[in-house]
Amino acid sequence: MRDNEPHEIPAQTSPGLTRSASGVGEPEHLGEKWATGTRKKWLRCENKALLECYYSSNPSQRGYMQRMCGEWERRNPHSRLMAKQLVAQCSNIHKRQLLSQLEIDEIQHKCYGKGEPGRQVRGEVSPSPQPEIGYEAPISTDTLSEAATDLKDKIMARINRQPRTPLQRLSEVPSESLMEDVNAALRAIPTTTITETNELIYASASVILEVLGYKSNHGSHEKQYPPWKRRLEAKIKAAQREVSQMTEAQRGAMKRPMPKRYSQMTIPEALEIAKQRLQALASRLKRYTRDNEARRINRLFATQPAKVYSQWQGNNNRADPPRLETEQYWKGIWEREASHNSDAQWLVDLREDHSNLPEQNPVTITVADIQHRVSGMKNWTAPGPDMIHVYWLKKLTAIHKRLAAQMNQLLRDGTHPEWLTEGRTILIMKDPSKGAVPSNYRPITCLSTTWKLMSGIIAAKISGHMSQYMSEAQKGIGKDTRGAKHQLLVDRTVAKDCRMRHTNLCTAWIDYKKAYDSMPHTWITECLELYNINRTLRAFIANSMRLWRTTLEANGKPLAQVSIKCGIYQGDALSPLLFCIGLNPLSQIINKTGYGYRLRNGATISHLLYMDDIKLYAESERDIDSLIHTTRIYSSDIGMSFGLEKCGRMVTKRGKVIHTEGVSLPEGRIADIEDNYKYLGIPQANGHLEQATRNAATAKYLQRVRQVLRSQLMGKNKSRAINSYALPVIRYPAGIIRWPKEEIQTTDVETQKLLTMHGGFHPISSTLRLYASRKEGGRGLVSVRATIQDETSKIHKYIKEKAPTDDVLSECLRQWRTEDEMLEEGPSWEDKPLHGMYHRNITEVADLNKSYQWLERAGLKDSTEALILAAQEQALSTRAIEAQIYHTRQDPRCRLCKEAPETVQHIRCWQGKHTWNAITK
C-alpha cells in the first residue's frame, strides 16, 4: 500500500458512511448487511480475499476502486459493500495490522506474479574440488636421539598403509619421554598437504600403541570365545554323557563297560556322583560367566560409561535395517535438490536492511586457535572415517603449526580434499516395537577429527562476528547462557504473570519436519552473505557443502553412501551454528510485527527459539494467528515445512484456557491444546504442570536406580552411575519447578530402600555416611535433596546475574521472591555416638586417608562395602544392638564371656578372641 496514491485510499470513510471494523478471530455472523450503527466483523480469510482483489485491480492506475469492487462482487455475489467501504477496510488492514507483513507480501507476490527474477546468491561455488595445494612445513635440523630415530623409521614405514583400522583407547597415559621422542620424530618428517599430515597423525598413533604393547584391531571384530568356557562346556558334555550312561546301566540296557572312574562303585552311587559332578560344573560355568560379565561391564564403565547407559536404555538392538529401503529413504531426504525463494518480498526488504553491515574481518587460523579448540574437545569420542581420536591431536603438539598453516591454505583456496568432510552415519533404532523400518532409525554422524577441529575454529570465528546480530530469543548456541533452562525460565515467567494478573495469553508451539535435514544449502549461503560473513569463509563453506557425503552404517556394516545436498551435518560445531543463522532472520521478522505478550514490568516477549523448537506468544487470538502465518510463510520460502501433528496452540483468557477451533493453514490445521504439551521436556498447560512433572521425573529416576542396582557394577561404579545416569533426571526440572521438601525426603528414603533391597545398604547404617565422599569414608552417593538444592541455587544465581540487563529475567527475579534455601547444617556422621565411634577411635592412631583408600581402589561389590561399613558403625545385630536399639533383648552382655556388652569392638578385641578360642578348643 505504500506505493499507491494516498488520496485514493482514505484513512477512514466519510462521516455519513458506516465504518468497517476488524474482528479477526472472534465469533461472528455471516450476514453482510450494513446498517447505520452496526459493524461488520471481518474474517481473516475475508481480509486476505479483499487484499487479493485490491492488488489484482492494479491500484497504481485510475479506476482501481471500480475494478476492485467488481472483482469482490464476482467472488461474493451477495455482498452489498460499496467500493469506498472496501477501500476503507484495506486501509484498516494495514493500519491495525490485521494481517502480518509477510502475509501481505505473499498476497502481493501472488497477484503480481514472479515479475523480475531475483538476484542470484553469490556463493562463489566452484563446480568441483580443486587439486590440493601444498604447504611444506619447515623441517627440524636438530639431531635426533636413538629412540626418536627408531620411532621416525617406524612412523615412515606405516604411512599410507591401507586400509585404516580403528585405534584402541589407552587405559594409561604414555610417558612424557615417549611423547617427546615422538614429537621430535614428527618435526623431522615433512608433509606438504593436510592429507599427508592426517596420514602422519594416524601412523604416529599406531606406532605409539605398538610401543605400549597394544594389539592391532585387524581382522574380525566378533567376540572371541573364551578358552575357559570352551573347556568347561566340554567337561559338561562329558558329564552329561556319563549321567546318561549310568542311567542306562541302572536300567540294564548299557552294553559298554562302566567309565573307569566309576568302575569301583555301585551303579546308584556312581549315578549320584555323576549327577553331582554335572551340577557342580554347571554351577561353575554359571558363576564364571557371571563374574566374567561383571569384569567386562566394569571395564567398559571405566572407559565408556555412555555405552553402558545405552545398553540399559535398550539402544543395543541388533536388527539390521533393509539395505535398499534405507538407501532410498535417506537419499530421498539428503539428496533432494532444494532451494529457497530468493524473490520473497521479506527477503528483499531484509537485504536492504542489511546492505550496510560491515564485512567480517579476514580470518587466519593460528597455533593458539588449534590449541584452544583441541583443549575443549573430548579425548575418546567415536572417530570418523579417518579413525583418529582427538587425544592424539592433543598429544602430538609438533603438528599443530603445520596444521594451522595448511588449514589457512585451504581457506585461501576455497576448497578442500573430499575425504575431509566425509562422515560415517550410524543408524540406531529408536523404538524396537516399530521394527526395522528406515524411519525408525536415528542417524548419528561421526566426522573426521581434522574436520571437527577446523570447523570448530571456523564456527568460533563466525560466532564472534554474529554475536552482535544473533537474536536474544535463540538460546540453542552461545556462551554464558543456560540454554534450554533459560527458555524454560522465560516461559515460566510468562505463564505465572498470566495467572497472577488474569490476563489474556495465546501461545503456539511450532515443530518442523526433519528440521536439520531440510534447510537448503542455498539459504545457508544466502544468510552468510546477508550478515556479511568474510567472503573467504563464505566461499569455503559453500564449496564444502557441495562435498558433504556420508556412509550409512548399521551394526558395523556399511549400507550405502549418500551425498548431503540438503540439510546439515549433526556431528561438528559448525553445522548447529549454520542452522541457527538460517533461522535468525525469522526473529527479526517476528520482532517487526510488534506482536507479543507484555509482562508486568513492561517487557515484551514474542517468541523463543532453541535450535528448531519455536514457541510464539501473543495477547490475542488474532495476533497469535498472524505470528503463526508469518512463521509459515518464512519457513515455506526457505524450503522448510511444519510437522502439523506436533504443532499446537493454546488460548488463555483471563488466566483460563478456552477451547477454539485452532488455526487453518494451507497444509492443514494446527489444533488447540487444552490438556498438556511438552516444551523442552517440561509438560505445559495453563502454565507448568508441576505435579505431573515431579511425578514423571521421580518415577524415571527410581526406575534408573533399579537398573543400576540390578547390574553387576562394583560398589564404587554403582554410586557413580546413580550420580551421572539417574540424578540428571531430577536435576533438569529442578530450579524451573518447585519441589516440596516432603517429596524430596520421600524420594531419598525410596532410594535408600532400594539400596537395602539389593544388599547395598544396611538398614540401620548411617544415611549421612552414605552421602559422604569416599575419600572421607563414605559411599560417594549424591542425595536428591543436595541435587535439587544445588541446581536451584545455580539457577537463582544465574537469574541475579542476568536480571540487570534482561527485563524478562528481572521480572522472573521479582516473582522468585524468596531467597535460596540453604542446606541445614546438621551433625556429620563422625559425630554420631554409635556410627562415628570407629572413626573417632582411629583418628588419633591411624592415617585416615590411607584407612579409607580401600573404598576407592579395592573394587568391592556394594554388598561387601555395606557389610564392612555396617560393622564399623556398630550396625550389626549383636546383643548390645538388640538391647539398646531394637529393644528386643534385656541383657546386652556377651554370650561368651558374660561380662562386657556384646559390641563389634568387643568381638574383635583380644579378650573376645581369646574367650572364643578357649571355648572352641
Where are these regions (language model features)?
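Conserved pre-catalytic core of RNA-dependent polymerases
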Residues: E352-P585, I907-Q911, W916
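Helix/loop segments that flank and initiate small ligand/metal-binding modules
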Residues: R731, S773-R774, V782-S783, E821-P901
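Surface polyanion/phosphate-binding segment centered on an Asp-His-Pro turn
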Residues: E132-E248, T698-V705
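Trihelical helix-turn-helix/Myb-like DNA-binding core that engages the DNA major groove
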Residues: K40-K41, S56-E103
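Short, conserved micro-motifs composed of acidic
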Residues: E8, Q12-T13, G556, I628, ...
